[in-house]
Regions:
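Short beta-strand scaffold segments in enzyme catalytic cores
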Residues: 110-112, 124-127, 163, 266-268, ...
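Short, glycine-anchored, charge-dense loop/turn motifs used at functional sites
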Residues: 30, 127-135, 267-276
Length: 325
């Protein structure tokens, strides 16, 4: 599927924990990972499980993977071959994650390509509690269709809505990649009680556009999610993949001469929008960041955006366009 495989030459970097120490019971150490993906899903799963274990040993209590970590980003083209990469949930990968969660007593959010039924596929995240139980799944609601991001060919939009998960350590919300551009999803998930929002992601540059648009594209991406943190008074965590991926078409040649250069820079934002830690653009990393959960209620009472919502005036939000158009 890829022109050539990427290889990890050294152990992925484990970033020192950011934030206050664990002396306070309100501290939640959150782990996010970023890595390259290669053609063989078995190699990707093996690497991802190792990174999850590394995060757990570094003290993380909630750990989230990047979007569709089991494969390369095959959505650069529309090709029926790639449906074979999907798997059921529960399935072999989520079973392995459940065992790891139970072994280390951690919550795991595992994002992968789901085969729900014959002809029905989703871009999905499995939520696994610290006892190893599969709590359920979130299915990506907003599905893009842009050059080299042809997801509508593969994924049926999610039908489970936006919800929060009361795990052992905190109430968590999960959305996926393209969802991050829509404030409605973040707001509805926060209204369900989420204290931390996770956005497993696969986003990068078209290399030919990077010089002109690259900085602005990345800043827009990060700013959108930091705004969700501010507007909803919660932490936001966005694990992204790295590496340049070329996907081969049926003729064996790359469908794009440039591929996609995934920009990494996974990050954690505080409820005030401050970036607590940001990963590199090109290194496999494990970030473990201490999140003070008291700051969620502090933000929501000092910046009372949830209090001041005018729900009586928002009926138009459920319309495709305004009455004056």
């Amino acid at each position: 599927m890829a022109a050539k495989k990427s290889k990890t030459k050294s152990k992925p970097k484990s970033t020192p924990r950011s934030g206050r120490s664990m002396h306070s019971s309100t501290i939640l150490p959150v782990g996010i990972t970023q890595m390259t993906c290669v053609e063989d899903p078995r190699d990707n799963v093996k690497k991802q499980l190792a990174l999850i274990e590394q995060a757990a040993k570094a003290g993380a209590k909630v750990i989230c993977t990047q979007e569709m970590f089991t494969s390369q980003y095959f959505c650069q083209c529309e090709d029926h071959r790639f449906f074979s990469l999907a798997e059921s949930i529960p399935g072999p990968t989520t079973d392995a994650c459940c065992r790891l969660a139970r072994k280390h007593g951690v919550v795991i959010i595992a994002a992968l390509f789901e085969r729900r039924a014959a002809g029905l596929y989703h871009n999905t995240a499995a939520i696994i509690d610290a006892d190893g139980s599969l709590m359920g799944v979130y299915r990506k609601m907003h599905i893009p269709d842009d050059p080299l991001y042809y997801e509508k060919f593969y994924f049926t939009p999610g039908d489970l809505g936006f919800r929060a998960w009361k795990t052992k350590f905190a109430t968590l919300g999960v959305l996926i990649c393209w969802d991050q551009w829509f404030p409605e999803g973040a707001r509805l998930t926060a209204m369900e009680g989420a204290e931390v929002l996770f956005y497993p992601t696969a986003i990068g540059w078209h290399p030919s556009e990077k010089k002109e648009y690259g900085i602005a594209q990345h800043e827009s991406w990060e700013t959108a999610m930091r705004a969700h943190a501010i507007a909803n008074g919660c932490y936001v965590c966005a694990p992204n993949r790295i590496g340049r991926e070329f996907i081969a078409g049926p003729d064996g040649r790359p469908v794009s001469k440039d591929g996609i250069e995934f920009w990494g820079q996974s990050f954690v934002s505080a409820p005030n929008g401050q970036v607590l830690h940001r990963a590199s653009t090109n290194k496999e990393e494990v970030l473990v960041v201490d999140c003070d959960m008291d700051k969620v209620e502090f933000a929501r009472t000092h910046w009372p955006f949830l209090r001041d919502r005018r729900i009586d005036a928002y009926a138009g939000m459920t319309k495709r366009f305004g009455a004056g158009v």
